């Protein structure tokens, strides 16, 4: 199904359709058109998709649809085992995925949990012991919970590797292998990656069974919504050039600052640049690995809310 007009044609339940309508979803994206029917059929999937293509809904909606017959309002943890596991490379992606799935499932009793490192493990353990049907996790923290027996994966029937290329880049392959060995052999496997590198294909060969390959963006392509321009600038003039660019292009038609992300190659550079931009009158802050998880989440929230303009 390469072309589709609306979500109703997938046979999704009314409570899922009403939730995505509230979220402003109208016409499915290319990967949603291709992936949702295949996931509903129970096939393994190897999906290639860039950021901003609607990837989360392409697996989140059919997975929720498949769980609905098992959904219940019981308070017994035994009635809410982990049935779907979504592995994410970072805390931020795990949070974003959990938020999206919680919105899709808002009109259902399906429980969704998220666990990652850098924060207190006790509240996560308590939530897991109460039971969750869908668990979004970073590999290392999930292994911590499995070792502490806060949860088990004995009834997990669907496993999703999200942004698998990033997980390999970050050295998570040994952790992923340990997790996969703890899962039932009979399960549905979905893997999504921005690229189909040789390493990803090797992982797919070990992880997926007769997968349907879905690719909606050219390998190594930039998301279609991004316009690329290159400016040749002397090393010593880069900050001045950036300031000039922000002054000339950093506002919308009403004169309000546009949300801007500036990437640099080092934490020290990020801190220095944020200070320089603040001195020039811009509302800027730096995000990097030396900040605590709470600081990073607050900064991301401020950027999302528009309280912070340049990150």
Locate the predicted segments by residue.
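Conserved helicase RecA-like core
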Residues: 1-311
């Amino acid at each position: 199904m390469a072309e589709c007009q609306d979500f109703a044609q997938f046979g999704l339940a009314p409570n899922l359709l009403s939730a995505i309508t509230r979220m402003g979803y109208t016409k499915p994206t290319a990967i949603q058109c291709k992936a949702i029917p295949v996931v509903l059929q129970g096939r393994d999937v190897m999906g290639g998709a860039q950021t901003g293509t609607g990837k989360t809904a392409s697996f989140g909606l059919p997975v929720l649809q498949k769980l609905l017959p098992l959904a219940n309002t019981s308070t017994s943890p035994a009635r809410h085992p982990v049935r779907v596991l979504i592995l994410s490379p970072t805390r931020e992606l795990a949070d974003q995925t959990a938020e999206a799935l919680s919105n899709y499932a808002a009109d259902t009793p399906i429980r969704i949990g998220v666990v990652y490192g850098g924060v207190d493990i006790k509240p996560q353990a308590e939530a897991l012991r109460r039971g969750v049907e869908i668990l979004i996790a970073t590999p290392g923290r999930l292994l911590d919970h499995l070792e502490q027996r806060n949860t088990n994966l004995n009834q997990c029937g669907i496993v999703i590797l999200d942004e698998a290329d990033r997980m390999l880049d970050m050295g998570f392959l040994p952790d992923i292998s340990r997790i996969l060995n703890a899962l039932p052999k009979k399960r549905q496997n979905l893997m999504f990656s921005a690229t189909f590198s040789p390493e990803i294909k090797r992982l797919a060969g070990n992880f997926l069974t007769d997968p349907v390959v879905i690719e909606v963006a050219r390998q190594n392509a930039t998301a279609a919504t991004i316009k690329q321009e290159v400016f040749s600038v002397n090393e010593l003039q880069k900050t001045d050039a950036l300031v000039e660019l922000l002054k000339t292009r950093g506002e919308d038609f009403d004169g309000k600052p546009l949300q801007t992300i500036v990437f640099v190659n080092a934490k020290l550079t990020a801190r220095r640049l944020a200070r320089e931009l603040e001195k020039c009158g811009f509302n800027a802050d730096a995000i990097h690995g030396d900040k605590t998880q709470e600081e990073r989440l607050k900064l991301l929230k401020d950027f999302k809310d528009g309280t912070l303009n340049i990150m």
